[in-house]
């Protein structure tokens, strides 16, 4: 089984993905985990990603897709749930090509919808609990706006 779980920051994607992974014996994949794994392995693609991250830049789609290709190839015969990936239409197109190259298909896409005010309140509380001073309400609202601009259009894709 190949699942995607999508939704805005604070919607509970990671929480729900963990529950589904356990219930259906799936490998839970998040972009952050994949990045860390590739960097820890000092793989070529991991080192590329680390260069961008160390400079404070976003990791480009082509690097993320290269990582995803490597990871999904390793797990091609396993059930997986992708948490929060893809985030953009180019990533979705690339992911579709990866699955085609593996002769696999996405079985289902789960989109979690939560009221924006609830999301902001959750993330503000989470920031307070984690002690992250950089997660201000302004930053949180900006992340929601970026999601609406770049990721929400995937729902129609």
Feature map (PLM): residue ranges:
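Glycine-rich phosphate-binding loop of ATP-dependent small-molecule kinases
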Residues: 1-157
């Amino acid at each position: 089984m190949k699942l995607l779980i999508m939704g805005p920051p604070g919607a509970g994607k990671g929480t729900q993905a963990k529950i589904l992974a356990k219930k259906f014996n799936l490998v839970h994949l998040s972009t952050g985990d994949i990045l860390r794994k590739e960097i820890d392995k000092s793989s070529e693609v991991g080192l590329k990603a680390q260069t961008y991250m160390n400079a404070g830049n976003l990791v480009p789609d082509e690097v993320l897709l290269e990582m995803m290709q490597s990871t999904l190839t390793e797990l091609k015969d396993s059930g997986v749930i992708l948490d929060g990936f893809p985030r953009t239409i180019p990533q979705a197109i690339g992911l579709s090509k990866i699955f085609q190259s593996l002769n696999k298909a996405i079985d289902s896409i789960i989109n979690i919808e939560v009221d924006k005010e609830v999301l902001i309140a959750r993330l503000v509380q989470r920031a307070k609990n984690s002690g992250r001073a950089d997660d201000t309400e302004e930053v949180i609202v900006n992340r929601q706006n970026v999601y609406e601009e770049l990721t929400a259009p995937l729902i129609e894709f």
